[in-house]
């Protein structure tokens, strides 16, 4: 990627927010090398981000690894075979009218290159539905040495060449998920590692034509209250945007996938949708620049109904960003159970998927009501130490 280098004398912050409480020396003028992105894809990135962040639509996250997909299939008594994964993914992407509610679909690498059971490329099916294909590009979590039993996300090695190939295959956005655990700290090291990795990924993605979805998931695990989640989330997003700026990421060409600000899953004090909305919107206003086109929330183990109610509460007034959803289990859970691996249940399962997609579409517009929701849709899906 071509870039231009300018020499400029200026005062620059030398520390991110984590170091803000330390005694700072008086700033001195320094001569620094400023790198200006010469982005060949900039206009396309902005257009793609705006397409995904369109009114009444959100993202279907169907990028579970083959191992995680195997767990989902096992829950309905199916073996984890490529044929079964193909059958389930075919069910999802061929749901009639899905594009009315879904603007983007995050795929696992196998899915990006996969065809439906009828032999048509899944990417082509999505495009016909006016759904932008995306791709999970991280390589999963591994232990972070020197931390309090925390993790970091791998996958930067070879990312540029992989993303160039994904672009040629039809992907137009990418997703990188890292996690922060409140019961384990989080340590300064873990937060910095998460933020830096996300920033490098975002810069590399934009250089290769893919809109990066930035996802530092704050896990639900723990007994902490909502105020503690809010405190940690402020630090995580401050670090993330600090390092994205350092890496010359164009904010108009990214999307965010944050956790909602909620109490820990094991906290005795539960939060109402209005409380979740108040805390989450306060976080966004404090930390997220209005240049960012879309905030696509993850559900993180909330029940299908809870995730929809919380999103609806956040859309009761105007926001400077498109506030929407990027759900996996909160869109698919009832659909998967309805299907049960039986061909005769495909239509009923697709209807269940469309029902949830429509509910969240209405929530994005602030028009959702929970009247008539099934009891099963209200069951929480939190799994302690969940591995995606």
From Swiss-Prot:
Active site: 215, 257
One Pfam short name: Glycolytic
Site description Necessary for preference for fructose 1,6-bisphosphate over fructose 1-phosphate, residues in chain: 388
Residues the entry annotates as binding substrate: 72, 299-301, 329
Induction remarks: By exposure to light.
Organs and tissues of expression: Expressed in leaf mesophyll cells.
Transmembrane segments: none
BP GO annotations: fructose 1,6-bisphosphate metabolic process; gluconeogenesis; glycolytic process
Keywords: Chloroplast, Glycolysis, Lyase, Plastid, Schiff base, Transit peptide
GO MF annotations, alphabetized: fructose-bisphosphate aldolase activity
Location(s), subcellular: Plastid, Chloroplast, Plastoglobule
EC number annotated for this UniProt entry: 4.1.2.13
Pathway: Carbohydrate degradation; glycolysis; D-glyceraldehyde 3-phosphate and glycerone phosphate from D-glucose: step 4/4
GO cellular component terms listed in the entry, alphabetical order: cytoplasm; cytosol; plastoglobule
Annotated catalysed reactions: beta-D-fructose 1,6-bisphosphate = D-glyceraldehyde 3-phosphate + dihydroxyacetone phosphate
Transit peptide feature range: 1-38
Job of this protein: Plays a key role in glycolysis and gluconeogenesis.
Family (UniProt): Belongs to the class I fructose-bisphosphate aldolase family.
Subunit structure: Homotetramer.
Protein name as annotated: Fructose-bisphosphate aldolase, chloroplastic
Taxonomic classification: Eukaryota, Viridiplantae, Streptophyta, Embryophyta, Tracheophyta
Gene name for this UniProt entry: ALDP
């Amino acid at each position: 990627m071509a870039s231009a280098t300018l020499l400029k004398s200026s005062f620059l912050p030398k520390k991110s927010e984590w170091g803000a409480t330390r005694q700072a020396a008086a700033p001195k003028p320094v001569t620094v090398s400023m790198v200006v992105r010469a982005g060949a894809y900039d206009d396309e990135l902005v257009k793609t981000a705006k397409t995904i962040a369109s009114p009444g639509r959100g993202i279907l996250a169907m990028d579970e690894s083959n191992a995680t997909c195997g767990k989902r299939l096992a829950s309905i008594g199916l073996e984890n075979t490529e044929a079964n994964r193909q059958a389930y993914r075919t069910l999802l992407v061929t749901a009639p009218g899905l594009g009315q509610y879904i603007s983007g679909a995050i795929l696992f690498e196998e899915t990006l290159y996969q065809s439906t059971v009828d032999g048509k490329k899944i990417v082509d099916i999505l495009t016909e539905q006016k759904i932008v294909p995306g791709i999970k590009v991280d390589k999963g979590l591994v232990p972070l040495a020197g931390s309090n039993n925390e993790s970091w996300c791998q996958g930067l090695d070879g990312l540029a060449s992989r993303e160039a190939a994904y672009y040629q295959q039809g992907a137009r956005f990418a997703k990188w998920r890292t996690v922060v655990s409140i019961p384990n700290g989080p340590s300064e090291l873990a937060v910095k590692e998460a933020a830096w990795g996300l920033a490098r990924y975002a810069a590399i993605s934009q250089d290769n034509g893919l809109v990066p979805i930035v996802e530092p998931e704050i896990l639900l695990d723990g007994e902490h209250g909502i105020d503690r989640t809010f405190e940690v989330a402020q630090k995580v997003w401050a670090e993330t945007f600090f390092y994205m700026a350092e890496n010359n990421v164009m904010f108009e060409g990214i999307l965010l996938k944050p956790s909602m600000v909620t109490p820990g899953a094991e906290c005795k004090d539960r939060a109402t949708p209005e409380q979740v909305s108040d805390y989450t919107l306060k976080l966004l206003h404090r930390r997220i620049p209005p240049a960012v086109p879309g905030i696509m929330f993850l559900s993180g183990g909330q029940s299908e109904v809870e995730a929809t109610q919380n999103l609806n509460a956040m859309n009761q007034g105007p926001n400077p960003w498109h506030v929407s959803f990027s759900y996996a289990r909160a869109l698919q859970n009832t659909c998967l159970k309805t299907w049960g691996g039986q061909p005769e249940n495909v239509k009923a399962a697709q209807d269940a998927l469309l029902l949830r997609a429509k509910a969240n579409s209405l929530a994005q517009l602030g028009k959702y009501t929970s009247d008539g929701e099934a009891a099963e849709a209200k069951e929480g899906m939190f799994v302690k130490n969940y591995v995606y």
